[in-house]
From Swiss-Prot:
It comes from the Bacteria. This is Large-conductance mechanosensitive channel. Pfam families: MscL. The keyword Transmembrane helix applies. PANTHER family: LARGE-CONDUCTANCE MECHANOSENSITIVE CHANNEL (PTHR30266:SF2), MECHANOSENSITIVE CHANNEL MSCL (PTHR30266). Homopentamer. The lineage of its organism: Bacteria, Pseudomonadati, Pseudomonadota, Gammaproteobacteria, Enterobacterales. Channel that opens in response to stretch forces in the membrane lipid bilayer. May participate in the regulation of osmotic pressure changes within the cell. Belongs to the MscL family. One of its GO terms (molecular function) is mechanosensitive monoatomic ion channel activity. Its main location: membrane.
Length: 136
């Protein structure tokens, strides 16, 4: 089997295609969540705690000197990214929870199979032995 044919079979499997679609949708969803946090959640939150813009939170480790730029830790951006992560994690958690719930509904418990002739015979022998032991 040629490498190209093997690769084509691998790439066309349902799991690989599903994974690719998931990655693309996930990337687009990440942009939506980032916008939700940056443009919808953080401004009112900043307003509630005194008109603060979290993006502006930073610590300057070294001021700019001539052509050398300043060294700055932007921890406000980090806080915003933490909010992004929490929202994405919660959304994924809820989606997985919903999928699991739907899968459980699909999986109805299978009826117990009827006992085989051997199992019936063994059960009768067991019952007879119990009766003999109880008489003794």
């Amino acid at each position: 089997m040629s490498i190209i044919k093997e690769f084509r079979e691998f790439a066309m499997r349902g799991n690989v295609v599903d994974l690719a679609v998931g990655v693309i949708i996930g990337a687009a969803f990440g942009k939506i969540v980032s916008s939700l946090v940056a443009d919808i959640i953080m401004p009112p939150l900043g307003l509630l705690i005194g008109g603060i813009d979290f993006k502006q939170f930073a610590v300057t480790l070294r001021d700019a000197q001539g052509d050398i730029p300043a060294v700055v830790m932007h921890y406000g951006v980090f806080i915003q990214n933490v909010f992004d992560f929490l929202i994405v994690a919660f959304a994924i958690f809820m989606a997985i929870k919903l999928i699991n719930k739907l899968n459980r509904k699909k999986e109805e418990p299978a009826a117990a199979p009827a006992p085989t002739k051997e199992e019936v015979l063994l059960a009768e022998i067991r019952d007879l032995l119990k009766e003999q032991n109880n008489r003794s």
